[in-house]
Amino acid sequence: MRSFEYARPETEAEALELLAEHGGNTAVLAGGTDLMNLLKRDVVQPARVVDIKNIPSLRGIKLHDNGVLIGANTTLDELNEHALAADYRSLLDVIEGIRSTQITANGTLAGDLCQLPHCWYYRNGHGLLAMQDGESLVATGDNRYHAILGNGGPAKFVSASRFAPPAIAWDAKVRIVTQARSASEGVETIGVKEEWLPLEYFFITPKTNSQGVTVLKPGQLITHLWLPAPKETRSATYEVLQLEGLDQPQVSAAACVGIEGGIVRTAKIVLGHVAPTPWIAHEASRWLVGQKLTADIAETAGQMAVAKATPLSHNDYKVQQAQTAVKRALLKATNQLGEVL
């Protein structure tokens, strides 16, 4: 691990000031469950690490009439133990699938959303795109856990976030803050500029190693996640987990469905760990509307969700896994899963 400056601000404005320095070559420390591993491996080499755990405004869960506001520093254990969490079953499904108590005790929701890929080429110093002499190491190498969708460009890794699929299915938004400078009569004022962005637009597929995996620019910070009020929406996440090895799913699917009179009125299906970004199954989601959700209908939705998959040389098994995950997430959301297992 290389040396770096350490800073612990107490306000958003202080954090943004510290993040903007060193040309933006800084890193945010919240739970630290992923960052510390990256630092030890020299995968990231920030000049300064900014610890945001001491900023009071970034912690806690607040109920509003039209939704729930979750602070970036809220741990997974705190979310799991909150009375409101039961209304967002798909998020709790993810927490229940995490084997490491260290991750649930220290890891944060915002930290998960900002995770960098677990691709072994990237984690061993080959860059996000894992290119060597103009050729993809992934395409010709061990690609068992890589993308089966959205992999037509140079990016073959899969999005590492476990909470993005269910949060996107809920139409979540994130609050992003940036340092704002203005001058009046020769006096400079430094403030905080905020933006609310639908989470589905937060993730990007990079075309170069320098682009990153989210829209966050150097000096920007996620402060909160917003989830709309659940109303009559039912949700679930189904993860295909490994018995051993990484505490990461091979594939996941999250579903939010609104049912009235036994008929699906709204639906959104999001796949995880199958593409460089969380993958919204638009066609399958639209097709579900107007259907009575049965095991056969759920299976067809799963088939539609992966119809355009382009597996690599060693990961075609993930197509069937993703199809099954969609089916089971839908049935789990409507309390039918036990009938088909």
Predicted regions located by residue number:
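C-terminal structural segment of proteins
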Residues: M1-L341
